[in-house]
Amino acid sequence: MFTNNNNYNLTNGNIITLNNITPIANVVTVSNGCIESINSPNNDYESIDLGGLTVLPGLVDSHFHLSNFGKRLEMINLKELKSIDQIVNKVDKKIKELDPGTFIHGFGWDQTRWDNQEFPTNDILDYFVDNPIILTRIDGHSLWTNRAAINLSIYDDNLISPDGGDIINQCIFIDNAMDAIRAIIPKHSIEDTTRWIKTASHQAMKWGITNVHDAWQDPL
């Protein structure tokens, strides 16, 4: 069904136009990514039989965080992992792809999905000594870090919990305790933001989202 051509007719489809005069079309003709015509196929173009599939206009998301979503896509996805071993394997694989000293970011771990349902201990990520690791819990209220990250922060070996925060097992930083860890993360560059926007845009288009209104964006 897919084509590498820039010009084609989509035929035999349930094509919803959102046009009151012709709400449903059978054929839509596309040229260089733009709709050329409805129900008037161009005989010089390749025709693709949709087999009755439905075609919708591109969706517009009115509240999107484009660069942040792209940034999240580059993080290790921990949402579906059900054990510490699975997380360690993901982290180990990511580290092997990057240079020493590169920050490792992950998102989505949830100890309530694990067998013991307890917060991890510091020895687990401290095994990785060459890369600062910062893994954000599913609710965004806790960070799981290693000693390589902690040593870059203002925390000393005593790891005293600040007001409004807590530190558990010398590696879990909760609420206000996260601030000093987040402060060590290198400021992103224009190149980073550009890459995140492109990554997020490609994923959004796969979902049929062709326009977004970014709800919040840092100045470039």
Predicted regions and their residues:
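Divalent metal-binding segments
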Residues: 6-11, 16, 20-31, 35-37, ...
